[in-house]
């Protein structure tokens, strides 16, 4: 059985990027440019349904009906602003703590850096 955690009211990070802090420090401009491109793609995804479904259908190799269903489901749960939330990271850590014992004592906030999302929000990429 496949469950949609957001549909069950369970906080879950639906989108976002994971980058080591050391990489971010030395390659911040690359990460910012990548996130700008991601923001542009997200805008197309949310604002141009037909174009998005056509592209997804082509590259996923699924029927249009299946692709549209997946599109509609993801759109319900995905945030237009990919700002990570402490609650969603906490849920992830809870989910992996059995196989990753360090997760049980990890501080969810230590995994979050919103500086790039904040910058792109000021630039108008996210609302």
Pin down the residues of each PLM region.
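Residue-level "edge-of-site" marker
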Residues: 7, 70, 109
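Phosphate-binding core of ATP-grasp and ATP-grasp-like enzymes
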Residues: 10
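A bilobed periplasmic-binding-protein/Venus flytrap-type ligand-binding module shared by bacterial periplasmic
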Residues: 13-29
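Short secondary-structure transition/capping segments
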Residues: 14-16, 77-79, 116-118
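Conserved C-terminal helix/tail region of periplasmic/extracytoplasmic solute-binding proteins
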Residues: 97-127
